[in-house]
Amino acid sequence: MQVYAVGGAIRDELLGKPSQDRDYVVVGATPAEMEAAGYRPVGKDFPVFLHPRTQEEYALARTERKTAMGYKGFAFYCEPDVTLEDDLVRRDLTINAMARAVDADGNLTGPVIDPHGGQRDLAARLFRHVSDAFAEDPVRILRLARFAARFHDFNVAAETMRLMREMVAAGEVDALVPERVWQELARGLMEARPSRMFEVLRECGALARLLPELERLWGVPQRADFHPEVDTGVHVMMVIDCAAALGAPLPVRFAALVHDLGKGTTPEDVLPRHIGHELRSVRLLEEVCARLRVPNECRDLAVVVAREHGHIHRSLELGAAAVVRLLERCDALRKPARFAQALQACEADKRGRKGFEHSDYPQAARLLAAREAAASVDAGAIARACADNVAQIKDRVHAARVEAVAQRLGAQPGE
């Protein structure tokens, strides 16, 4: 049998980038021979094995045949007569359809095997599908869009974009299961330029099918004095790219993505103002989270950011009492880490505007100081002092927090 490194490892080596992908294909072997060599079988749909020493995955070379709609509708053939070229032709993009032989010590040997022009397309910075079999798996649309967020100086070949549009029109995207959609979107959000993922999905028509709440933001105007970029869709893309530049974790990036969904449902007769968009955004993002089965950590932060980002932006103007009410609505005292993430999402929102990309965000430091002051109040001591009148506890604790915040911020308690 012969082992080859394939896909991302070869692509990244040619780009001079460190590789996170390390996939191996084994040609000329049977499952029994792999197990006899010490490999442990783990594949459910087709033969995949863990290396006995490195625990890396090794898959038998295979061909596949479409049997039904969706990304699970495939039959696989994994016999020893499947060649490396047979395996490479089933792959999605030319830049991922290259291989190099691997010796017994796991070292790459010999020339790059490139039957589909992957090196040419790397040089041209193009995403191009290997064959029309690309159309058989709708996940490939999401994967390509995710790659666009990573390799953001690449473009999609015209014939590949045309094929993706045909797939969307044929309803292939509608057959995707929610968990897989979320998995790919989440991975794309964590890339260097997440906006590119959504631009590609929008261009091929998939965004309107998967996230219509986001798609409808393009073309919706905002007040130019607050948003020089005007277009709401453009603004949201700037916000998620700013969150990426800040090194934000996934919950922050997701909150940045969905914080303004309500602007897409603002009545036309009140545009470019968006009164009440915060609560509309909460309702819409909760629908998105339910549909895509978004993790609770991401959903809960997104709700706080969508509901409170306007108040957080204006917090420099708030007195101590209003600041404490804001902290309480955000549950900042019980969940300080989530509150810090909310502030980071709001910073991305404030900076995600044309001409404001490098502006400061003093609101974050002020609110973190206020949270620290409010948290210093000994609520237990107040509760014990009010043992004979427990109805007063909540108001007394609140008043003490207002006083503590006022002292820290140099503001009047009643402001």
From Swiss-Prot:
Cofactor(s) the protein requires to work: Mg(2+); Ni(2+)
One MF term in the entry's GO annotations: CCA tRNA nucleotidyltransferase activity
Any GO BP: tRNA 3'-terminal CCA addition
Name recorded for this polypeptide: Multifunctional CCA protein
Disulfide bonds: none
Residues reported in the UniProt entry to bind CTP: 8, 11, 91, 143, 146
Domain HD, residue spans: 232-333
UniProt keywords, alphabetically: ATP-binding, Hydrolase, Magnesium, Metal-binding, Multifunctional enzyme, Nickel, Nucleotide-binding, Nucleotidyltransferase, RNA repair, RNA-binding, Transferase, tRNA processing
Catalytic activity: a tRNA precursor + 2 CTP + ATP = a tRNA with a 3' CCA end + 3 diphosphate; a tRNA with a 3' CCA end + 2 CTP + ATP = a tRNA with a 3' CCACCA end + 3 diphosphate
UniProt subunit comment: Monomer. Can also form homodimers and oligomers.
Enzyme Commission number: 2.7.7.72, 3.1.3.-, 3.1.4.-
Highest taxon listed in the record's lineage: Bacteria
Native source organism of the sequence: Cupriavidus taiwanensis (strain DSM 17343 / BCRC 17206 / CCUG 44338 / CIP 107171 / LMG 19424 / R1)
Binding-site positions, ATP: 8, 11, 91, 143, 146
Source organism phylogeny: Bacteria, Pseudomonadati, Pseudomonadota, Betaproteobacteria, Burkholderiales
Note: A single active site specifically recognizes both ATP and CTP and is responsible for their addition.
